[in-house]
C-alpha cells in the first residue's frame, strides 16, 4: 500500500510541477500565448504519459475525481480513497511550489488571475467527464497514451485549459 501512496503523491507532484513549470517557461520564452499554450500542452502530454506508464502498476490516479470513481466502482476502499485525495492535493501543492521556486518566484505565490464564471465551470465538467470516459473505456495497456492525448486535446478545446483535476485546481491557486 505504501507504494500506491508514494505513487499518488510523487506522481501528482511531478505532474503539477510540469504543468506550472512549463507554463512559466513558455511565458518566459515567448509573449505569444499560442506558443506558450503549445509548450505547456506538449510538456503536460509527455509528463502524463511518462507518469502513468511508470506508476501504473502501483497507482496512477493523480486526481481526486478518478479516485472517487474508483471508490464507487469498489476498486479501492474509502480509507484508501481518502488518503489518496490528501496525498494528491498535497502533491499538487508541492509540485506547484517547486515550479515557482525553480523559476525564482516565491514558492507560495497566490494566483491573481480571475478564474471564475459559469463557462469555466461547464468547461471543467466537460473536461473531467471526458477524462473519466477515456480512463474507463480504454484498455489498461493504452490508458497512458489515451489519457495523455485526451488532456492534450482538452487544453485546446476547453476555455479553462482543462484542469480536469480538483487537486490541480487547488495546487494551481498557488501560482499565477
Predicted regions and their residues:
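Membrane-interface helix-loop junctions and terminal tails of multi-pass membrane proteins
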Residues: 1-176
Amino acid at each position: 500500500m505504501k507504494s500506491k501512496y508514494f505513487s499518488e503523491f510523487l506522481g501528482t507532484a511531478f505532474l503539477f510541477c510540469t504543468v506550472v513549470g512549463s507554463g512559466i517557461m513558455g511565458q518566459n520564452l515567448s509573449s505569444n500565448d499560442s506558443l506558450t499554450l503549445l509548450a505547456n500542452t506538449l510538456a503536460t502530454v509527455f509528463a502524463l504519459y511518462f507518469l502513468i506508464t511508470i506508476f501504473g502498476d502501483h497507482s496512477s490516479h493523480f486526481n481526486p475525481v478518478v479516485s472517487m470513481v474508483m471508490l464507487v466502482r469498489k476498486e479501492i476502499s474509502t480509507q484508501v480513497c481518502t488518503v489518496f485525495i490528501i496525498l494528491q492535493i498535497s502533491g499538487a501543492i508541492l509540485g506547484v511550489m517547486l515550479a515557482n521556486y525553480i523559476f525564482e518566484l516565491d514558492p507560495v505565490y497566490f494566483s491573481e488571475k480571475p478564474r471564475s464564471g459559469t463557462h469555466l465551470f461547464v468547461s471543467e465538467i466537460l473536461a473531467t467527464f471526458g477524462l473519466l470516459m477515456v480512463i474507463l473505456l480504454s484498455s489498461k495497456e493504452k490508458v497512458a497514451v489515451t489519457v495523455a492525448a485526451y488532456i492534450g486535446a482538452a487544453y485546446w478545446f476547453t476555455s479553462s485549459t482543462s484542469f480536469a483535476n480538483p487537486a490541480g485546481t487547488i495546487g494551481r491557486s498557488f501560482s499565477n
